[in-house]
């Protein structure tokens, strides 16, 4: 099958690193760590697994970080090489293992890509998985599979940047007939935002800032609009087309994230700006809760400076190497936390699985996110697809996906 793979032996890594500094185009190719090539289709690891023929495979910001060698080495123990890239997916079941008969060949599914205890045949499950906190699994490097936290970072299973991949029956979520492939492929990134919302849910009337209006920022707005509709959401959006999407999805206000935006951001958060001897101003007052969905160091600093004293900051953006002045964290007694992937949450008297809830919100129309898949490319046009995803300002891309 044709697929886009990643492997990083030292000579190839050094060549890619040097060439990529000349031009981004050199991050992919015959001599790069990321290559488009023919690979063997993955085998079913056991009877509990199914083979899935990919229909759409999304390009995630973390995938672009892998291609550009920007991912932190701290995450490397949770991968095994070579792997087929891609964890955002929708596909069609092509083969069933002997123990997966509750599904049918031909069914459309989207796959929760976490490779936690159940796919790894770990019994008993770890404490985190037993409690439904699958993103906190302590066995991502153990059990019946090679090391890897996700589909698309693990050798021998494939990924959604390939024609086929395999998944454990516990990972499958059926796609209703009324749900388009474009909607379904957004289930995974939207589930991350649903997980973040349940982990730090705004109360009615709270003021909320979403920093970044790429895919994750826009999906975060959609999640908040569906789950906390009485929160007042402001988005810091770099490009006008992103601001337009944000307003359609439920934001109350969009602040342009270019040029001198701090005064307007302070106004939106009802903050008073104080100018230190050196550096950017700090806000007194501000937003009750901030979700950082982009921006690296700058996004984190804006969050710390414009969240009110005693407020909450949530990091979704997979920021790795960041230089940040952390003074506002203690000066304003902020609570800051990271969020990864998806899991289960107690909400009222019910337990909510964030991945399944994301699929339900999209299918029911409460999260009208299908229009965010703005570009689709055949896999052979991988160079153009990756370039389009990188150049959002010029291409006005939100979610770019490979179409099979």
Over which residues does each language-model region extend?
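C-terminal capping/lid region of NAD(P)-dependent oxidoreductase domains
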Residues: 1-7, 11-18, 280, 284, ...
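Glycine-rich beta-strand-centered segment in the early N-terminal region that forms part
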Residues: 40-57, 72-130, 174-178
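Mid-domain Rossmann-like dinucleotide-binding core that forms the NAD(H)/NADP(H) cofactor-binding site
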Residues: 172, 176-264
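C-terminal substrate-binding/catalytic core of Rossmann-like NAD(P)-dependent dehydrogenases/reductases
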Residues: 267-280, 284, 323-373, 383-384
